[in-house]
Amino acid sequence: MATDLTVEVEDKPGSLASIGEALGGSGINIEGLFGASVDGRGLIHLCVEDGPAARKALEGAGLSVTDEADAILGPAVQGASDPGTMGAMARQIANAGINVKAAYIATGNRVVMVTSDNAKLMELMANM
């Protein structure tokens, strides 16, 4: 299972580079990334395969990891560029009673999701 790490950084040039350099320097690949500026701070969600090693690298570089959660790094989404694909997928997840806490696109048209029931989501995705 993959890990979603939330890193809080200053909203300034170079903050994202610091994250990439810390992970790259430790041989850790970023599978997916989402970032936004919120109230003058940068909030970055990262999907990595080795959460403990990524956390160690980030904190070793003086970066603040504010949250960590198990994440599903799903297979490539068929028709990812077609209108309605995400809506149809999200409807199936909602109909199964699963709450999506975080979702973003990863490399290779894969999707990263942190949910209220990752095991149930994995079963559902196997049948999509």
Q: Residues of each region from the PLM?
A:
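A conserved regulatory-domain signal marking ACT and ACT-like small-molecule sensing domains
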Residues: 1-128
